[in-house]
Design a protein with these regions (language model features):
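Short alpha-helical elements
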Residues: 1-285
């Protein structure tokens, strides 16, 4: 059980905007594709792409949900132009996040899998909403016992809080249904995976075992052998993902106000990048 004596990190991005801007400038030089660097009229822009990336991460750290409200803090900054250029940075943000995955050593860590809801409207509008009508649907939020319209984010997090990868599905998709595909796409070197009661089932455990992973989930209280099986240390480690999701919610991962698919992806990627960036700065500085 020595691996369960882990050190948690707060994951708040405690860095000045100047340093954040310098980090984003370095990332841009290293990872930005030529199609982005050498597009037309780049010599005429007043605000660099790296500065826009820094501003997006800064907005997430400030916890400001509305991009329109954030743009009002800056004199002469057009919200529509800022929003359009932010969406152009989506491939770069995606590349940076996956590069961080390769640089962070998670060997020996236990992985935790869970999901969180991303509603795109208030519950009263569940059956009248028109946005994302072909890719979102109605799901159930068990923590608040309410039905919502939107998406569900399935995430894999290390036991000390690094978000390794995620997948977005319709709100109605069951947690266990997305697990195998998410593990296939991620290919983590870690072999131990913790989940909640939503991942119970011999079929899922067998599929993951065939892939080389051991899945542990707590038994429900009314199940036979629950007292013996339910290791309280493992259950405590699994619950740490709740704190990680709470911080992702602060970074606006759950409160996504985008009204286009590209905007939705961009804001979710920024939230995850800000979260993992805070992890790396706190751990390696």
């Amino acid at each position: 059980m020595n691996c369960l004596k882990l050190k948690r990190f707060s994951h708040h991005l405690q860095v000045s905007f100047t340093r954040l801007n310098n980090i984003c400038r370095s990332w841009y030089k290293l990872y930005a594709p030529n199609s982005l660097k050498h597009r037309r009229n780049t010599d005429q822009i007043k605000l660099s792409d790296s500065s826009i990336l820094a501003m997006l991460i800064w907005q997430a750290e400030l916890g400001i949900e509305s991009q329109r409200r954030f743009c009002r803090f800056f004199v002469g900054l057009s919200h529509s132009r800022f929003n359009r250029r932010a969406r152009q940075l989506l491939p770069l943000i995606y590349l940076i996040r996956h590069t961080l995955n390769q640089e962070v050593d998670l060997s020996g860590k236990i992985l935790i899998i869970d999901s969180f809801p991303v509603p795109v409207c208030q519950p009263v509008r569940n059956y009248r909403v028109k946005i994302f009508h072909d890719i979102a649907d109605i799901g159930y939020k068990a923590t608040k016992k309410v039905y919502y319209y939107g998406f569900k984010v399935h995430a894999i997090v290390s036991d000390d809080g690094y978000l390794l990868d995620y997948a977005v599905t319709k709100a109605s998709v069951h947690d266990a249904k997305e697990t195998v595909e998410l593990m296939n796409n991620t290919h983590p070197t870690n072999h131990y995976l913790l989940g909640d009661e939503g991942y119970l089932g011999k079929d899922l455990a067998a599929k993951l075992k065939h892939m080389g992973y051991v899945l542990w989930t707590p038994y429900r209280k009314n199940m036979q052998g629950a007292k013996k099986h339910n290791n309280h240390q493992l259950m405590a480690v699994r619950r740490t993902i709740e704190s990680d999701f709470a911080l992702l919610s602060y970074y606006n991962a759950e409160n996504n106000r985008a009204r286009s698919l590209a905007g939705f992806q961009e804001r979710l990627e920024v939230a995850v990048l800000a979260y993992n960036m805070a992890y790396c700065l706190e751990r390696f500085n």
